[in-house]
Amino acid sequence: MDNLKTSVHEIYLSLSGEGISTGIPTIFVRMAGCSLRCGMTVGRKLWCDTPYALSPKAGEEMSVNQVLDKIQELSAVNIQILLTGGEPLEGRNREFSITLGNEIFRIRNSSGFYPRPRVETNGAESIEGMDQFVFTLDYKLPGSGMEDRMNLKNLEIYKERKNPLDEIKFVIRDKNDFERCLEIIEKHALVGNLLASPVQGELSPEILAEWIKYSLGSGLRLSIQTHKYIWGDQRGV
């Protein structure tokens, strides 16, 4: 596993900031490289909160063993591991993430504590056949300009997995996005952990909360990026 490498932007210990694992101590493994440019529609700005990790060259070449060593250095006990980016399932990151996930699962499976790493993925890359992971699966809405890149088969795989730790995240820019989110949930009969998160600086949490309050039966829950309330735009915390 020393020969298999990818570009890793950063590895650090913090608290999970959003979704069902909010507040849980977590080791973040951020890989470099993502081909999506969310929010960059006509006359509007990129909203990605990690633009510094979009380039595949925005990191240090690391092997699977080096990443495992860094994880062990950060925490001697088993805590949640989150593979994020960039996009951990795109390009060469994909094979790297699968190999890393398999090794973490092999090491941790007997302990019973967080044996499966969580993968934050943008919805464009397939999640098929990856039982060694739990997923935070994005679905990009019209306001992102990236909805045509979504792999719709992932929604069916999400349902088939029936993993209570999996979640689908919808990032909401405006009312049109919210209505489209409700359409997707109904059309694909989605249940489970369905998260709605506002685009920071473009939609207030208060407004999104009101919309969710009156979308009874959708199964949506509000998800706020709590790490931004604690640390602002600081990186690696």
Curated annotation (Swiss-Prot):
The EC number(s) this enzyme carries: 4.3.99.3
Positions bound to Mg(2+): T50
Positions bound to [4Fe-4S] cluster: C34, C38, C48
Annotated residues for binding of S-adenosyl-L-methionine: G86
Residue positions binding substrate: L15, S16, G17, R30, T84
Sorted UniProt keywords: 4Fe-4S, Iron, Iron-sulfur, Lyase, Magnesium, Metal-binding, Queuosine biosynthesis, S-adenosyl-L-methionine
Keyword Glycoprotein included in the entry's annotation: no
GO MF entries: 4 iron, 4 sulfur cluster binding; carbon-nitrogen lyase activity; magnesium ion binding; S-adenosyl-L-methionine binding
Binding note for cofactor: Binds 1 [4Fe-4S] cluster. The cluster is coordinated with 3 cysteines and an exchangeable S-adenosyl-L-methionine. Binds 1 S-adenosyl-L-methionine per subunit.
Known role: Catalyzes the complex heterocyclic radical-mediated conversion of 6-carboxy-5,6,7,8-tetrahydropterin (CPH4) to 7-carboxy-7-deazaguanine (CDG), a step common to the biosynthetic pathways of all 7-deazapurine-containing compounds.
Record note on quaternary structure: Homodimer.
Identification of the protein by name: 7-carboxy-7-deazaguanine synthase
Organism for this UniProt entry: Leptospira interrogans serogroup Icterohaemorrhagiae serovar Lai (strain 56601)
